[in-house]
A protein has these predicted regions:
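Extracellular/periplasm-exposed beta-strand and loop segments of Gram-negative cell-envelope proteins
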Residues: 17-33, 60-89, 116-144, 169-192, ...
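Outer membrane beta-barrel translocator domains of Type V secretion systems
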Residues: 1-101, 212-228
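Membrane-active amphipathic alpha-helices enriched in small hydrophobic residues
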Residues: 42, 111-115, 162
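Outer membrane beta-barrel transmembrane domains
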Residues: 39, 101, 130-235
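Solvent-exposed flexible segments
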Residues: 97, 107, 112-120
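Short hydrophobic/aromatic-rich motifs at helix boundaries and adjacent loops
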Residues: 10-13, 120, 199-202
Length: 235
């Protein structure tokens, strides 16, 4: 278009990971998650370097949970576990500006607002709590992210990048009930910092397929490491 370049298309996503949660009551739990979904993404890059983008997505998440810190009827710690499966949907909008610092280095300053809704589920507890039913409420996550990324072209082979971001979670509380009583509710509400490093494999043709390999480290309310591999085709 006259203002720049409009890019849009479908997306497929799949991911997996593991987690550890700590409640104020002293209960520690560990688990694994995986998700898979579809969506749509759109981005407008203006000739001035300004860009804005958005996406919507829908999918399903499977998770398991295990803890040896649950309190049994006798007051001592017991082991319990469960499996869960529920749908999710989400969306994001963002705005930023890419500035060319020299022939091979660019700076990207951006702001994003991200929203995710994960549906509730009822699970049957295994282990010492065998047979008890836990009803999980839906979880809503609304996050604001401000960040910057530097990228450097690596000749004809691709682009290195590194970035920093600040993220604030406005919600993210996971509530549940058992026998009509509320359980301790973990929450990721609060501030987190993110450091990212990555490499995009792509030749000089801007419409050529690309592979984006990235790693992220988190500190603050969210702690840990994550990675991603994105396959991008433009036509």
């Amino acid at each position: 278009n006259n203002a720049g370049k409009l890019t849009y298309g479908p997306l497929l996503e799949y991911g997996w990971g593991n987690y550890t949660s700590h409640l104020d009551s002293g209960i520690r739990a560990d688990g694994n998650t995986k998700y898979y979904g579809i969506g749509m993404i759109v981005r407008q890059d203006n000739n001035s370097g300004l860009y804005y983008e958005g996406s919507v997505r829908y999918g399903r998440m499977d998770a398991d949970y295990a803890s040896g810190d649950m309190i049994g009827a006798g007051g001592s710690k017991v082991y319990a576990d469960y499996d869960s499966s529920s749908s999710y949907y989400g969306a994001h909008v963002g705005i930023g500006r890419v500035s060319k610092l020299n022939d091979t280095v660019k700076a990207d300053i951006y702001a994003k607002l991200l929203y995710t809704h994960q549906s509730g589920d009822s699970v049957i507890l295994g282990g010492a709590g065998n047979g008890e039913v836990y009803d999980f409420d839906a979880v809503n996550s609304t996050r604001a992210r401000l960040g910057a990324r530097l990228s450097k072209e690596n000749g004809e082979r691709g682009t290195y990048y590194a970035g920093l971001a600040y993220e604030y979670e406005f919600d993210g509380e996971a509530k549940a009930t058992v026998k009509g009583l509320s359980t301790p509710a973990p929450s990721i509400k609060g501030s987190s910092g993110m450091l990212e490093l990555g490499y995009i494999i792509q030749n000089k043709d801007v419409n050529a397929p690309a592979v984006d390999i990235g790693f992220q480290g988190w500190s603050g309310k969210k702690q840990g490491f994550s990675g991603n591999i994105n396959f991008i085709w433009k036509f």
